Structure formats: C-alpha cells, structure tokens
Regions:
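ATP/NTP phosphate-donor binding region
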Residues: 1-78
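Short, surface-exposed connector motifs at secondary-structure boundaries
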Residues: 12, 77-80, 101-108
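Gly/Ser/Thr-rich loops at beta-strand to alpha-helix junctions
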Residues: 20-23, 86-91, 113-119
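Short amphipathic alpha-helical segments
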Residues: 27-28, 94-97, 124-126
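Long, hydrophobic/aromatic-enriched structural stretches that serve as scaffold segments
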Residues: 67-68, 73-98
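Short, acidic/small-residue loops that bind anionic groups at enzyme active sites
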Residues: 98-123, 131-138
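Conserved anion/nucleotide-ligand pocket segment
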Residues: 130-172
Length: 172
C-alpha cells in the first residue's frame, strides 16, 4: 500500500467536486470560511473548475468533466493533497472518465471526502494500491470551532494524527 507524503506547512491543498460542489447554502459560506481559515494557517489553495459549478444533473458538472477534473488534479504537481467539495449521489457516473492508470503511476496523494466520495476512497486502495481517507469534505472545515473529527482528519493529512478511534455523539 502506498501512503502519501504528509501535507507540509505552507503546502497546497487542492479541491475537486466529483460529486456536489459548493454552490448552495450552507456549503458555499462554509467553504468560503474554510478557505479563509486555511489561508490563515499558511496553506495555499488550488480550486478545481467544478468547485462552484452547478450545471450537472445531480452532480457539479457533466460526468466527463468531473472525471477529468479528478484525474488532472490528482496527478497535478500544483497541489499536495485533495479534499472533495462535497458528497452527493452520482459520482458513480464519473468513474468511466477517471484515468486510474494515470493515477496509479502518479505519486501518491491524500484524498479526503465522504458519502459519494466512497467511489474514489475505495477505488484508490483497491485499484491503485494507495491509501485514502473517508472523512469530512471541504465545507466541513468551515465550522467554528472544528469538531474533533475534523481536527483528526486534517491531522491525518499533515501526519500529526496516526490513530483515530471514534467520537461521542455527532457533529452539530
């Protein structure tokens, strides 16, 4: 299993929207606040073309566009890890347009997302022998303060957290 390098201070976080983007409230405002927080923490941001797209049916853009964005941003040297903008329902339609061979040959990179993103967090390990994180999407990082699960997920990306156990209750 390939484990990606940790996100370093001052590194670049990439964002993709292979399912829903951040076009409606509360996701739009939460993603804006998350971006502000990451910049204050010293990180650079690399937003994919579908992050604010809403011309797809049940997803941010056409499946061809979503698959292309996911492939291009995963293999890009312009970002150090990827966080999905949101979950959703139809990411399964993107998979025919994701170049898993290209991704398998690229350096390992952390991918973080939940819900519909299971289509990628499951296939990265099984098809590309690369670890992925099933965890919060981009807008979740806009909450104040960060829930412990959000702190831990970011800690996995940075290498500060190696073990995650569980949480009392749920996020509010």
């Amino acid at each position: 299993m390939r484990f990606p390098e940790n996100l370093k201070k001052g590194g670049t976080i990439g964002f993709v929207a292979p399912s829903f983007g951040c076009t409606t409230e509360p996701y739009k405002s939460a993603f804006a606040n998350a971006q502000k927080k990451w910049k204050e923490m010293g990180y650079q941001l690399d937003l994919g073309p579908n992050c604010y797209a809403d011309h797809g049916i049940g997803i941010s853009a056409a499946p061809e566009e979503c698959g292309k964005e996911l492939t291009e941003y995963y293999v890009s040297e312009k970002n150090d890890c990827l966080i999905s903008c949101g979950g959703g329902e139809l990411m399964c339609e993107d998979l025919d347009y994701v170049d898993f061979e290209k991704i398998r040959k690229a350096p390992a990179k952390w991918y973080l997302g939940y819900s519909d993103n299971t289509h990628f967090t499951y296939l990265l390990p099984t098809l590309c022998d690369t670890a992925a994180v099933y965890g919060p999407c981009a807008s979740d990082f806009g909450m104040e303060p960060w829930h412990k699960s959000v702190v831990d997920a970011f800690g996995v990306l940075t290498g500060e957290v190696r073990t995650v156990r569980g949480y009392e209750g749920w996020e509010r």
